[in-house]
A protein has these predicted regions:
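Histidine-dependent nucleotide/RNA phosphoesterase domain, centered on the 2H-phosphoesterase fold
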Residues: 1-172
Length: 172
């Protein structure tokens, strides 16, 4: 693994809240007095930083994920620290998924930076806040991951992979 550094056009694997949850997050920001200066469409949770965005890196990620088979998982956030939404305690699925994703990418020879995954979602960047509060739970199923180039105040999508349920659920 390589050290994380400042990239001009960083590339990330991430997931984003769905529109309904994004609307709930906008309401939460209003209730908490968080100024929305970062477009809600760009709110995300980073699963894995890749490095500088290049055609080669994008192609390598596409090849690695061509055969990546993973199921959807749920995330739930129930408290805020500063301007960062934090997860409900006890969630194992996001970390398990992230480790499997990292292993798959690394097995395909993609050099990855050192990265300690910690589930969170930043609602604002650049400010400082001592806010600490429980919030009404915001939960959704993560059913796709995105390859995003970030920079200059925008997200450019370079890939999208659905997560597919492999085992049928039965109502009893």
């Amino acid at each position: 693994m390589q050290a994380i550094r400042q990239w001009r056009r960083p590339l990330y694997l991430m997931f984003k809240p769905r529109p309904r949850e994004r609307a709930a997050l906008v309401r939460l920001c209003a209730a908490l007095g968080i100024e929305i200066v970062y477009a809600p469409e760009r709110w995300h949770s980073t699963l894995l930083p890749i490095g500088e965005s290049t055609r080669q890196a994008i192609a390598a990620i596409h090849e690695a994920l061509r055969v990546f088979d993973a199921e959807p998982f749920s995330v739930a956030f129930d408290h805020i620290e500063g301007d960062t939404l934090k997860p409900r305690k006890g969630q194992r699925a996001p970390g398990c998924f992230q480790r499997a994703l990292t292993a798959r990418i690394a097995r395909c020879g993609v050099p990855l930076p050192d990265y300690a995954f910690s589930l969170h979602l930043n609602l604002a960047y650049g400010g400082t806040s001592v806010r600490r509060a429980a919030v009404p739970p915001i939960e959704w199923p993560v059913d796709e991951i995105l390859l995003i180039e970030s920079g200059s105040g925008r997200h450019v999508e370079h890939g999208r992979w659905p997560l597919t349920v492999r085992q049928a659920a039965f109502a009893f």
